[in-house]
Structure formats: structure tokens, C-alpha cells
Amino acid sequence: MAKNTAIGIDLGTTYSCVGVFQHGKVEIIANDQGNRTTPSYVAFTDTERLIGDAAKNQVALNPQNTVFDAKRLIGRKFGDAVVQSDMKHWPFQVVNDGDKPKVQVNYKGESRSFFPEEISSMVLTKMKEIAEAYLGHPVTNAVITVPAYFNDSQRQATKDAGVIAGLNVLRIINEPTAAAIAYGLDRTGKGERNVLIFDLGGGTFDVSILTIDDGIFEVKATAGDTHLGGEDFDNRLVSHFVEEFKRKHKKDISQNKRAVRRLRTACERAKRTLSSSTQASLEIDSLFEGIDFYTSITRARFEELCSDLFRGTLEPVEKALRDAKMDKAQIHDLVLVGGSTRIPKVQKLLQDFFNGRDLNKSINPDEAVAYGAAVQAAILMGDKSENVQDLLLLDVAPLSLGLETAGGVMTALIKRNSTIPTKQTQTFTTYSDNQPGVLIQVYEGERAMTRDNNLLGRFELSGIPPAPRGVPQIEVTFDIDANGILNVTATDKSTGKANKITITNDKGRLSKEEIERMVQEAERYKAEDEVQRDRVAAKNALESYAFNMKSAVEDEGLKGKLSEADKKKVLDKCQEVISWLDSNTLADKEEFVHKREELERVCSPIISGLYQGAGAPGAGGFGAQAPKGASGSGPTIEEVD
């Protein structure tokens, strides 16, 4: 396989997944724990940084410094209502840095703060490493997916996270579109089909309607909620049980981060159980002040707790149908994507909405997005496999884009659901006589007045020659690239003077310098992680050597071949090292290596003398090279004859 392989990464709110297209098919790659999805968690401890399963597994012990949900922060402002409401549920601290949210944690004994892009970049680095371990060579090219309903700043911030992780982001593509590729790739030649992708994940919800016809995937409309998913169902369960605990035990656990985290983990498990059983039990020992919490919940009660959220998933479905100008009967396939679509009630609501139509569950809801991203990555790298070479993706802009005209009116140049890439030009003029310049303010959203929409950026076109109002002609061009990221240019026709802006949300966007700095920091963290790995390996090697020596001299088979004095010398030294290890677990690699050499100086002559004297190599399971047998990194095992 050529070294210029590109990977597809589904960077999820709660879990991420990576795939690669090679030899004509997609492989979803398992991580070092054998899991095909990896938690989007990053944990900081006194000694190290953990990413993925390792981070999620220790979350109850370290809730304040374990960061997740970075996708719910990325590209948003600190003052956003959703950020403020999420902060109530998060055990980690979110601080305000010039209206940008930053996550504050304790790492190696000092307080550190990170932008959401940095946290996401750590997860991306992990996914990149998972792919590299599988492929056996470095990987830099990647396609990363985002919810279709992500706005410009969220897309741009996700792209920045990729850059910080050392990736060359070939393209940002929409999750439902990627899932549609996974669905439609093997279904060519069936004529034109209208497909509705219903994608309900851990933190985001998208609905997209596509027409798939012989390798052409054309998105007709998209709708969704970038803040609805499995986490919100977990939150409802957590609140329910916090109240139940209050009723039963007259105690409020909501301020105890560790108790709430243990409860949340149990709720997540119960929620999954309720997709296949009608009842789930929670058993948490010593949840709070020594009180054991044993309780249960029925599926009906869970559905009742989340009923408004579940019903709310149908609004975007209706909106997408309206925008695509289709009615229910015109949809051929209803495809479920995202782990939360396993919830029976969600399936039933969708099925009833489409008058009892069967839902298509043929693709893996956890892996479909990464699968499609991997296919798109291969196409962008020029893969010539027959099943992808004719594939064409036509995606859309999720929100209308325009600028503010006199009186604060929103004038849209690009309507929502326009196929991208696209370019629209319109001519504007001045509002007052001899106006020397115009302020171009770019907004996204569907409301009539700009104050109700989202300001993406603003720039000035100055130096307009004096003229009566309405005479100067200013040509404004909106150009959206294939990533859904916008460039705006304004030109004064009389002077040819132009000014342009890549909408990079001056307020929300990281500057080039910041990104550079973060790239270097990411490298540094990676180096620190490696030092930590080497340190642990040296510690394990010392520990296993000490125990091996101890068991070697205690071996019954050596009675009479080893003087008591020598035996005592080895045992005392081993015991000394083992005690030293217990009280110096955080020593440097060099100290472990030094201790080991010290131990070898005592043991080697005795052990090798023993085997030469005994003339019986291999006695007690050690070859003549016994001391070196344990010198690999990490614990080693000896074979016993």
C-alpha cells in the first residue's frame, strides 16, 4: 500500500472512530484495547495525560481533570446559552477567555487551561496513532466529519483541531452525508433513491435527505440540532435519580462530583440496557456518605423522562422534508445512524411518522460515519478502485449566508441548502452621499433581521471616491468551498479596489500564531507521554527482575547448590529493591535503570556461578542467561521446563 494513505475520522461528542479504505474496501480500525470506537475523553493526572479508554476508565477517580464533550464547546462562545447550561452538568471547570471557553484542569501539579480545539486535537492525535499502528507507517492526510448542522465557526475550529494534531485535513464533510456513502456504496444500479439519514449520536442530531443515483450522492436538504443526543438522555436519568436519592435518604448528592460521575456511568449503562430490556437495575455501593444506592428503572419511565427530547427529533425531519420539497411517501429508505437510534422509542416515533414504514438498520450506526469518511478520503487521494472512482458527492450549506443592509436587514446571498461549493455575487451601493467606505457585516441564519442571526465577521472597504448616494457600485461575492467554509470579497467597481475576508470568525477563531503554538505544544505533550511510557517500562523491568531473582533463589530445586549466605544476599537485595519501588513509584527512568544495574551486580555472579557450578543449565526454569532474560521492557514471562 502506498504511503500516502488517507484516513477518515468520525470525531464524535462521546466516541470517535477511524477507518481506512484500502484494497477496495473500508477497514474500521480497532484501538489498543480492541475497541472499534474510542471515547472522546482526555484526562490529566499528576503524572501523565490519558486519551480514550484509559481516560474514561479513570473518570470516577478524577472527575475534575477528565475532559469530554469538547465538541459541545468547539466553535462556540462562552456566553452561549447552551455552553452555560452544559457547564452545570460538567465536573470539569470551564473558564472565560475573551468570550472563548477554555477548560481548566490540574496537570502534573499545576493549573493549565486548554481551548476546545486543543482537547479535540488530542482525541484526533489518538485516532491518528490508532491508524498508524494498524497501517505500520505515519499518516497525515485525513477527512474529518462534523454534524451537518455545524455552523461556519464550528467547522473552522474542527479544521484547526486537525492542524494542531499534525493532520493535513483534506476535507471537512457532514456526518449524515458520510453515512449515506456507507449506505449507498454497495447499492449502485438500483436507480434513483431518496434516502433520509436520521443521525442521533452522543451529542448532536442531524437529518439529511439525499438522492442517490448511480454513484451520485446529492444532498437535497439538511436540518438538525447541534445540541441533542445521548448525553441529554443521560442527564435526564441523572436528575431523576438525584431526586430519588433525596427522597429516600434526605441527602443531596448533586454537589459531590465523584458521586454524580459514578451515578452518570451507571445511568449510561442502564440506558443501554433499556434498549434491549424493559427494565434496568442500578447498583452503586457506597454512593454517598457510605449509603449504597440500589434502584431500578423501567423503559416506560425512561421514555417518559425524555419524551419531549424524543418527540423533538421529528421537527428537523419535517423541516428537511419541507426544504427538500418532498412528502413522506417520496422517501424510499429511512437509514438510522448514531448510537442513540438504538432506543426503541426513537425508532417507533420515526416509524409512526412515516406511517409504519420499515427502518433500515443495515449499516453499523457507530461506524457508518467513519466508513463514509474513509471512502471520501480515498477519493480525494485519487483512489481508482472501481466502486469509488465514479462517486460524486454534492453537499449543501446548512444555513443561509448574507450581509446586513440598511436598517439591520439580513440580505441573503446564499440560501440554505444550496449545493456547495458555490459562489454568488450581488451589487450593493452606498447609503449616504460622499460615503468614504462601507462596512460589510457577514451573517448566517434564517431570520429577517441580522440581530437575530449569527455574526460571522466584518470588514471595511474604504477609499470609495466621493459620490452621491446610490452611485458607487460595490460588488460582493460569497464563495463557499467544499468544506462549507466561506470567503467573502468586496470590490469597488470604479476603482477596482478590493478587500476580502475568509470568514474565520475573528472573535471565535484561533489566530495563526495560536495554532502554531498549539502544534508545538501538542508535540511537547506527545514527547512527555513517551517519557512517561519509557519510565513505566523501566519500572516494570526492574520489578519483574527483582521478583524473578527472588523466585530463582527460593526454588526448591536449588537446595544444596546455593549457600545460605548467597541466598540471603540475593533475597535481602531483592527485598530492598522491592521496598524501594513501593516508596519510589514516581522515580525517573534513569533511577530504575540504575537500581536494576545495582541489583544485577549482586545477583548476576551468584546466579551464573550457580548454573556453571551445577552444570545444569535451565534448572529452575532459567537458562544460563537468566538475568538478561528479564531485560525486555515491561514484565516478562519465563517458560518452566
UniProtKB/Swiss-Prot annotation:
Region Substrate-binding domain (SBD): start-end pairs: 394-509
Record PTM text: In response to cellular stress, acetylated at Lys-77 by NA110 and then gradually deacetylated by HDAC4 at later stages. Acetylation enhances its chaperone activity and also determines whether it will function as a chaperone for protein refolding or degradation by controlling its binding to co-chaperones HOPX and STUB1. The acetylated form and the non-acetylated form bind to HOPX and STUB1 respectively. Acetylation also protects cells against various types of cellular stress.
Pfam families: HSP70
Modified residues (N6-acetyllysine): 77, 108, 246, 348
Record region (Nucleotide-binding domain (NBD)): 2-386
Compartment(s) where it occurs, according to its Swiss-Prot or TrEMBL record: Cytoplasm; Nucleus; Cytoplasm, Cytoskeleton, Microtubule organizing center, Centrosome; Secreted
Modified residues (N6,N6,N6-trimethyllysine): 561
Region span, Disordered: 618-641
UniProt record, GO biological process: DNA repair; lysosomal transport; mRNA catabolic process; negative regulation of cell growth; negative regulation of cell population proliferation; negative regulation of transcription by RNA polymerase II; positive regulation of microtubule nucleation; protein folding
Keywords of this entry: Acetylation, ATP-binding, Chaperone, Cytoplasm, Cytoskeleton, Methylation, Nucleotide-binding, Nucleus, Phosphoprotein, Secreted, Stress response
Membrane spanning residue stretches: none
Location of Phosphoserine modifications: 604, 631, 633
Chain sites annotated for binding ATP: 12-15, 71, 202-204, 268-275, 339-342
UniProt GO molecular function: ATP binding; ATP-dependent protein folding chaperone; protein folding chaperone; transcription corepressor activity
Extent of the signal sequence: none
Residue numbers carrying Omega-N-methylarginine: 469
Modified residues annotated as Phosphothreonine in this record: 636
GO CC annotation terms, alphabetical: centrosome; cytoplasm; extracellular region; mitochondrion; nuclear speck; nucleus; perinuclear region of cytoplasm
Modified residues (N6,N6-dimethyllysine): 561
Family, as annotated: Belongs to the heat shock protein 70 family.
UniProt subunit comment: Component of the CatSper complex. Identified in a IGF2BP1-dependent mRNP granule complex containing untranslated mRNAs. Interacts with CHCHD3, DNAJC7, IRAK1BP1, PPP5C and TSC2. Interacts with TERT; the interaction occurs in the absence of the RNA component, TERC, and dissociates once the TERT complex has formed. Interacts with METTL21A. Interacts with DNAAF2. Interacts with TRIM5 (via B30.2/SPRY domain). Interacts with PRKN. Interacts with FOXP3. Interacts with NOD2; the interaction enhances NOD2 stability. Interacts with DNAJC9 (via J domain).
Record function comment: Molecular chaperone implicated in a wide variety of cellular processes, including protection of the proteome from stress, folding and transport of newly synthesized polypeptides, activation of proteolysis of misfolded proteins and the formation and dissociation of protein complexes. Plays a pivotal role in the protein quality control system, ensuring the correct folding of proteins, the re-folding of misfolded proteins and controlling the targeting of proteins for subsequent degradation. This is achieved through cycles of ATP binding, ATP hydrolysis and ADP release, mediated by co-chaperones.
Domain comment in the entry: The N-terminal nucleotide binding domain (NBD) (also known as the ATPase domain) is responsible for binding and hydrolyzing ATP. The C-terminal substrate-binding domain (SBD) (also known as peptide-binding domain) binds to the client/substrate proteins. The two domains are allosterically coupled so that, when ATP is bound to the NBD, the SBD binds relatively weakly to clients. When ADP is bound in the NBD, a conformational change enhances the affinity of the SBD for client proteins.
Name used for this protein in its record: Heat shock 70 kDa protein 1A
Organism the protein comes from: Mus musculus (Mouse)
